């Protein structure tokens, strides 16, 4: 039955207060057992009750409020209302309400003409009590201009649906789902809200978000999070389709939640990350288009990081694990660092498969997790690893996709259901894949072998040639054949019950590779189910077009102007002679040059045969020039290569300025601007003088050559000879060479040359030569003049004191023969200094005065000293060090400020060293902690001590940019480890707020 509010006295004239009339219609419908309350087109003014929880209008079971359409029927809060309203329309507080809803109208909070916190729609049962609202439906509802939340279904609700609705210009979130069970948000739009577009929070589970759109919101587009109570985390959330763009923070943030799937969405143009997974488990990110995020600074398109709540309401540290990222297209903006990045904070077991990543600045993928994997192929789904021991283990998988590692011993591995990877390791192993497409991996020839008299081969019990595979790529076999010349023979036993893959070529111990498969597989094994070494795609002397596949391949162009495209896989591309165009495609590709003439240019004749690399990805791809003798980057002379960007900034040349007899010099180009291209992107030849002779833990005898070598004996009593050349003898631990009161374990250097050789002690903390005390080393020659000792007389707790023996009388040994600290020191004065570092690792000491320090490239240490200093680390992992609390301070009483500004601090890479000042962690700025505070316009972050010294000075540092959500204890060197506590944001909008009725 329909109940028209005008029959109950409502006017809808935009002036009169229609609250009582509309409520009377609702009550009448409820009293009749249910019905539809109809509001014709018009503006209906309403007011709140005595308590915020009274709301304006209370909807009841079996009642639906229906208007004439969004924007046609408007329910608007009266002008001048100055109290909180927890729902202009809401279900009754403390009552279970069911089968109710609203459609085809607009709720207007009249934000500009009211005060107090006003929410639009609110429903839900008492938090923490038994009971729930049920079967709630909202369709085609617009909620606007609320000072609080738009849609706020809050606390226990079962089976809520909100579809085809809009929330905009609200003071907090557009849509909230707080402790919703089995609900749906479908085809909704949330825009221009002050905080998040959608906020799914507080134990919500089994919830679907389908084809929703969030844009232009001040916070994130969509957040899945626990909230600020210590309650069960959200789980079982499906985000399918939709778009999340142009939001101030992340496009999508998944925080303290588990079993969340994000798929088929477009996420772009957001201020921070496209997607951030933050202290969450078992998140799947599938088949999304994520692009052009990081609009407010340098961020990854997808970030995986753990969440430290040890100082929060739970006291727990939530590690991000089990993230599955597959089939996404990721295109960076000019600011995007990585396509996908893990933080080095315990985040692990991430699985990345078949993602396309392009146009990022630092690299496609950055993983720190020991068990995290990345591949260009579709994933088999390994989200757990079962690992054995050196003994005889039995490992049994589940229905999930797992990796089973037997290690040593005679192991029994059973993958169960799922697409599993089984690697028995050493020993005679029994391998059963179970259901699913399984991969049996052999990592060494001695993992499965036989001799002339005994068998130590593994047995695969259930190989399915239609879907299973055997990975032999690590063993160097080239394919099937007669078992000779690097091939494997397929041999069936006489009973036809067992098939062997075997080599007839034995190693020095008489071992030849062999693996057994239960069953008759004669004629069924081929390249489709056996993975051998990298295939080669080869051209000829003509102009070839070579196209790879999704597998890892080697493409050889040879002569001619070739076009090589690796497509997927970790490929090797060798253009050969001619002017070649090289595209690696997806994967970590290697572009290799085997001769100087492979890519060359003659500036006299104008002949350009330089190769062009179309899609080089820093941090993932490599440039191999090791065969050409180049030893590093530099000015293009003396065996170095110069990096030069053209005037348009769209092409980078890597070139030598040294020509051959015909006037040609080596040169190739990269499409794009790679002005910061570093040596880590290259495979260089070993520089002269840098060959490393490395010993073991035993008593080694290392003999150098005529080259310049680094000789490192390691532990044990070693005999070291550098040979001719300028050699460096390196000692990295005190126990590499030492003696006790009774016994010598000192290394002996037999041919130390005072003119050319040096001893590297830079890792041991010695300050120089002296009397052997106070961190110095004494030079002592024995009585016969046949041996010289470099020794310390200060012993450690075990009675060990450093000592080296050198053959001969080397009493002329000086500090110039020692390497104690290679870092160059640039030191200012008491005035206002400008110190500019170079490409090396340097220490910049400003001293007194208002100094400007710029580290340039290299891993630098910057210490501004007293005064109001400006510190820029430049590229590299830099340390900003403070030795005195008055090096950077503010006095709020006198108005005097001596606050340093760090212009380019990069969390996760740079460090701030406060260990000398006694601070123990981040916190509220009291009791030895520092508060993290954002200024009002969000452009500068402060580290503040709230406690003053006797003169009223408070230690304070300024960091350019909004780093509030990015700083944690790992970015600092404190006096002692301490848990990170909550951080304060001044003038900014937090990403999380306790939702309170």
From Swiss-Prot:
Signal sequence range: none
Alphabetical UniProt keywords: Alginate biosynthesis, Calcium, Isomerase, Repeat, Secreted
Compartments (UniProt record): Secreted
Hemolysin-type calcium-binding repeats by residue range: 388-403, 406-422, 424-439, 557-573, 574-590, 695-709, 712-729, 828-839, 846-862, 864-880
Main location: secreted
Additional comment: Each enzyme of this family of C5 epimerases introduces its own characteristic sequence distribution of G-blocks in their substrates, explaining the extensive sequence variability of alginates. These alginates of varying composition have different physical properties and are necessary at different stages of the bacterium life cycle.
Family to which the UniProt record says this protein belongs: Belongs to the D-mannuronate C5-epimerase family.
Protein name, entry field: Mannuronan C5-epimerase AlgE5
Organism: Azotobacter vinelandii
Lineage start: Bacteria, Pseudomonadati, Pseudomonadota, Gammaproteobacteria, Pseudomonadales
């Amino acid at each position: 039955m329909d109940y028209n509010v005008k029959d109950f006295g409502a006017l809808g004239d935009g002036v009169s207060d229609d609250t009582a009339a509309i409520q009377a219609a609702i009550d009448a419908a409820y009293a009749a057992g249910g019905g539809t309350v109809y509001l014709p087109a018009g503006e209906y003014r309403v007011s709140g009750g005595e308590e915020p929880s009274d709301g304006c209008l209370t909807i009841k079971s079996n009642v639906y409020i229906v208007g004439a359409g969004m924007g046609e029927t408007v329910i608007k809060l009266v002008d001048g209302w100055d109290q909180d309203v927890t729902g202009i329309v809401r279900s009754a507080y403390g009552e279970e309400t069911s089968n109710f809803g609203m459609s085809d109208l607009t709720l207007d909070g009249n934000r500009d003409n009211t005060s107090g916190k006003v929410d639009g729609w609110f429903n839900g049962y008492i938090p923490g009590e038994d009971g729930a609202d049920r079967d709630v439906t909202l369709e085609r509802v617009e909620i606007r201009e609320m000072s609080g939340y738009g849609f706020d279904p809050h606390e226990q609700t079962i089976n809520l649906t909100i579809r085809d609705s809009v929330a905009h210009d609200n003071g907090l979130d557009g849509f909230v789902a707080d402790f919703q069970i089995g609900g749906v948000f479908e085809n909704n739009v949330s825009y221009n809200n002050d905080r998040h577009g959608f906020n799914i929070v507080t134990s919500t589970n089994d919830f679907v978000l389908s084809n929703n759109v969030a844009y232009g919101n001040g916070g994130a587009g969509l957040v899945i999070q626990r909230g600020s109570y210590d309650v069960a985390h959200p789980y079982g959330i499906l985000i399918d389709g939709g778009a999340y763009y142009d939001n101030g923070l992340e496009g999508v943030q998944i925080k303290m939640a588990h079993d969340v799937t994000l798929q088929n969405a477009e996420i772009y143009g957001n201020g921070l990350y496209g997607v951030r997974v933050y202290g969450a488990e078992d998140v799947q990110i599938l088949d999304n288009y994520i692009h052009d995020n990081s609009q407010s600074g340098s961020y990854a398109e997808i970030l995986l990081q753990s969440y430290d709540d040890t100082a929060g309401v739970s006291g727990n540290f939530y590690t991000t694990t089990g993230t599955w990222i597959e089939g996404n297209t990721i295109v960076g903006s000019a600011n995007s660092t990585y396509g996908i990045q893990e933080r080095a904070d315990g985040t692990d077991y991430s699985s990345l498969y078949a993602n396309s990543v392009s146009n990022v600045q630092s690299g496609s993928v950055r993983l720190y997790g020991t068990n995290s994997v990345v591949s260009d192929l579709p994933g088999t789904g390994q989200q757990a690893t079962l690992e054995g021991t050196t003994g005889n283990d039995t490992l049994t998988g589940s229905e999930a996709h797992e990796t089973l590692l037997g290690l040593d011993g005679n192991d029994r591995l059973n993958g169960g259901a799922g697409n599993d990877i089984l690697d028995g390791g050493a020993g005679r192993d029994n391998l059963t894949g179970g259901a699913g497409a399984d991969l049996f991996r052999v990592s060494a020839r001695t993992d499965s072998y036989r001799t002339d008299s005994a068998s130590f081969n593994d047995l695969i019990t259930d190989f399915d040639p239609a879907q299973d595979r055997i990975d032999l790529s690590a063993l160097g076999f080239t394919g099937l054949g007669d078992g000779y010349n690097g091939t494997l023979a397929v041999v069936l036993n006489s009973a036809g019950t067992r098939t062997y893959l075997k080599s007839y070529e034995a190693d020095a111990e008489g071992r030849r590779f062999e693996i057994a498969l239960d069953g008759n597989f004669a004629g069924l094994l081929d390249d489709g189910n056996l993975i051998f070494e990298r295939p080669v795609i080869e051209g000829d002397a003509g102009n070839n077009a070579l196209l790879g596949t999704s597998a890892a391949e080697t493409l050889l162009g040879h002569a001619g102007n070739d076009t090589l495209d690796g497509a997927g896989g970790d490929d090797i591309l060798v253009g050969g002679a001619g002017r070649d165009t090289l595209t690696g495609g997806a994967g970590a590709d290697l572009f290799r040059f085997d001769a100087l003439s492979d890519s060359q240019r003659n500036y006299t004749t104008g002949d350009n045969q330089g190769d062009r690399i179309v899609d080089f990805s820093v941090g993932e791809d490599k440039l191999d020039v090791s065969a050409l003798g180049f030893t590093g980057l530099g000015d293009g002379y003396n065996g170095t290569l110069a990096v030069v960007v053209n005037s348009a900034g769209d092409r980078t040349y890597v070139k030598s300025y040294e020509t051959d007899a015909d006037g040609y010099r080596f040169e190739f180009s990269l499409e794009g601007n790679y002005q910061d291209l570093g040596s880590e992107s290259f495979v260089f030849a070993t520089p002269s003088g840098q060959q490393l002779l490395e010993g073991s833990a035993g008593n080694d005898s290392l003999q150098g050559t005529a080259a310049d070598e680094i000789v490192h004996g390691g532990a044990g009593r070693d005999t070291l000879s550098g040979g001719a050349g300028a050699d460096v003898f390196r000692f990295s631990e005190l126990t590499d060479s030492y003696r006790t009161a009774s016994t010598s374990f000192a290394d002996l250097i037999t041919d130390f040359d005072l003119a050319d050789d040096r001893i590297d002690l830079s890792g041991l903390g010695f300050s120089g030569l002296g009397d052997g005390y106070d961190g110095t080393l004494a030079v002592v020659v024995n009585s016969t003049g046949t041996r010289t000792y470099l020794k310390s007389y200060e012993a450690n707790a075990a009675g060990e004191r450093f000592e080296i023996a050198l053959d001969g009388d080397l009493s002329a040994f000086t500090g110039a023969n020692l390497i104690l600290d290679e870092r160059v020191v640039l030191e200012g004065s008491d005035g206002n200094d400008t110190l500019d570092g170079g490409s090396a690792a340097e220490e910049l000491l400003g001293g007194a005065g208002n100094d400007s320090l710029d580290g340039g490239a290299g891993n630098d240490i910057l210490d501004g000293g007293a005064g109001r200093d400006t510190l820029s680390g430049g590229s590299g992992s830099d340390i900003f060090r403070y030795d005195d609390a008055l090096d950077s301070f503010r006095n709020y009483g006198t108005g005097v400020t001596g606050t340093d500004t760090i212009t380019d601090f990069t969390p996760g890479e740079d460090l701030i060293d406060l260990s000398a000042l006694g601070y123990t962690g981040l916190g509220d700025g009291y009791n030895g902690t520092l508060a993290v505070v954002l200024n009002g316009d969000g452009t500068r972050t402060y580290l503040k001590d709230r406690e003053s010294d006797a003169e009223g000075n408070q230690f304070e540092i300024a960091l350019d940019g909004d780093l509030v959500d990015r700083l944690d204890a790992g970015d600092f060197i404190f006096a002692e480890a301490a848990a990170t506590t909550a951080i304060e944001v001044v003038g900014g909008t937090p990403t999380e707020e306790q939702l309170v009725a």
